[in-house]
Amino acid sequence: MASQGTKRSYEQMETDGERQNATEIRASVGKMIDGIGRFYIQMCTELKLSDYEGRLIQNSLTVERMVLSAFDERRNRYLEEHPSAGKDPKKTGGPIYKRVGGRWMRELVLYDKEEIRRIWRQANNGDDATRGLTHMMIWHSNLNDTTYQRTRALVRTGMDPRMCSLMQGSTLPRRSGAAGAAVKGIGTMVMELIRMIKRGINDRNFWRGENGRKTRSAYERMCNILKGKFQTAAQRAMMDQVRESRNPGNAEIEDLIFSARSALILRGSVAHKSCLPACVYGPAVSSGYDFEKEGYSLVGIDPFKLLQNSQVYSLIRPNENPAHKSQLVWMACHSAAFEDLRLLSFIRGTKVSPRGKLSTRGVQIASNENMDTMESSTLELRSRYWAIRTRSGGNTNQQRASAGQISVQPTFSVQRNLPFEKSTVMAAFTGNTEGRTSDMRAEIIRMMEGAKPEEVSFRGRGVFELSDEKATNPIVPSFDMSNEGSYFFGDNAEEYDN
């Protein structure tokens, strides 16, 4: 594991980051959660939502989106400079669902962005509370990761749909800051860099002039973030090469795709945080729980305990399975879209199925969907055990799947062997070891050749009973190896469309 001396913990990324002790970090994260909760309570009052309606996850998503849009300065500026028909750049809104006369009705609400900003700041002691906004962005990103497979985006950038386990955070907005960068997968960073290089190839002014200097420094910063996620010297050296290139072009794209493929076996460190919807924090705050005083962590038992005691509802379409909808949201809450399903089933205490076997579409309801046939049901978000989130790739001291996903990106720090289909991964590495990065490529391939899927990662780490808050008695799970480990297994999940 890379020396962590230079890295800040997530919580420091979540906070404004001077070194803090554990208690201060917990209080500071708790304060952020309090702010989201207070904001949500206030919005439910503004919208005149009943308790049940306020706990509806679709209403939560609309409210979260409204505040994110109200604070999206770049887009707000763009909308004011490029007025489009029928869009008021000063307003934000979305669908709010209410129970009227025994059925669900959709109501489109519209608010001044200024008003939403005022309510948000008031809930956050007058601050802009950017951390709380980022927290909601990560929750939306985790929900997208669980709902959609990014096949099309992968293919467009010349990558392979089987690399979907590297795509965590691929829908996070640019403005998500350090906390956002921490949760982005290797493939996400590679894709952002490839898009940038392609623009440079097609537009000769991209790297030039005053703007080009900013572009260049953004490029180098992204390369450094990606380099920091790799755990082997050869992969990092390769990133130095890409970063230092005078004129990034196809050679760099090749190197980036190579390094992304290598991450299927030599996994990068990607942070995982349990970010819950605002409709979980709101009721907890209104019941008198003081997150700042009690302290809160996104990577320990706290989110599990909170979900054990929360009641969240969802709209259900006529042919959807409420249990499947629950699994989708449960996985999103724990940022577990790319974790091994055998492990998730163990932690959750009920079988977790691959995406393609779930009879459920996304959580959001499109504006043209018929509300007459909508029912609602309780989401089952409780778990049997809890486990500590990891930000390492879980590589063994050195370092079986399908046509769909062929590797995992661990979420929980729990002992298991990390399944990957070695022959499938290695088949992608035939031939091309020439060029300036040939020695690094050879070294990376050598390490991958030596990796054994049956080797155990996170040795000795286990899950914990929910009563074991201090994590004193790890329970090391045993797995049925015959079971499929990948969520996007040869899959038919819908595509994510911006």
Swiss-Prot record:
<feature type="compositionally biased region" description="Basic and acidic residues">
    <location>
        <begin position="8"/>
        <end position="21"/>
    </location>
</feature>
<keyword id="KW-1048">Host nucleus</keyword>
<feature type="short sequence motif" description="Unconventional nuclear localization signal">
    <location>
        <begin position="1"/>
        <end position="18"/>
    </location>
</feature>
<dbReference type="GO" id="GO:0046718">
    <property type="term" value="P:symbiont entry into host cell"/>
</dbReference>
<comment type="subunit">
    <text>Homomultimerizes to form the nucleocapsid. May bind host exportin-1/XPO1. Binds to viral genomic RNA. Protein-RNA contacts are mediated by a combination of electrostatic interactions between positively charged residues and the phosphate backbone and planar interactions between aromatic side chains and bases.</text>
</comment>
<protein>
    <recommendedName>
        <fullName>Nucleoprotein</fullName>
    </recommendedName>
</protein>
<keyword id="KW-0167">Capsid protein</keyword>
<keyword id="KW-0945">Host-virus interaction</keyword>
<keyword id="KW-1160">Virus entry into host cell</keyword>
<dbReference type="GO" id="GO:0019013">
    <property type="term" value="C:viral nucleocapsid"/>
</dbReference>
<dbReference type="GO" id="GO:0005198">
    <property type="term" value="F:structural molecule activity"/>
</dbReference>
<keyword id="KW-0543">Viral nucleoprotein</keyword>
<feature type="region of interest" description="Disordered">
    <location>
        <begin position="1"/>
        <end position="21"/>
    </location>
</feature>
<keyword id="KW-0687">Ribonucleoprotein</keyword>
<dbReference type="GO" id="GO:1990904">
    <property type="term" value="C:ribonucleoprotein complex"/>
</dbReference>
<comment type="function">
    <text>Encapsidates the negative strand viral RNA, protecting it from nucleases. The encapsidated genomic RNA is termed the ribonucleoprotein (RNP) and serves as template for transcription and replication. The RNP needs to be localized in the host nucleus to start an infectious cycle, but is too large to diffuse through the nuclear pore complex. NP comprises at least 2 nuclear localization signals that are responsible for the active RNP import into the nucleus through cellular importin alpha/beta pathway.</text>
</comment>
<dbReference type="InterPro" id="IPR002141">
    <property type="entry name" value="Flu_NP"/>
</dbReference>
<dbReference type="GO" id="GO:0042025">
    <property type="term" value="C:host cell nucleus"/>
</dbReference>
<keyword id="KW-1139">Helical capsid protein</keyword>
<dbReference type="GO" id="GO:0043657">
    <property type="term" value="C:host cell"/>
</dbReference>
<keyword id="KW-0946">Virion</keyword>
<dbReference type="Pfam" id="PF00506">
    <property type="entry name" value="Flu_NP"/>
</dbReference>
<keyword id="KW-0694">RNA-binding</keyword>
<feature type="short sequence motif" description="Bipartite nuclear localization signal">
    <location>
        <begin position="198"/>
        <end position="216"/>
    </location>
</feature>
<dbReference type="GO" id="GO:0075732">
    <property type="term" value="P:viral penetration into host nucleus"/>
</dbReference>
<dbReference type="GO" id="GO:0019029">
    <property type="term" value="C:helical viral capsid"/>
</dbReference>
<keyword id="KW-1163">Viral penetration into host nucleus</keyword>
<comment type="similarity">
    <text>Belongs to the influenza viruses nucleoprotein family.</text>
</comment>
<dbReference type="GO" id="GO:0003723">
    <property type="term" value="F:RNA binding"/>
</dbReference>
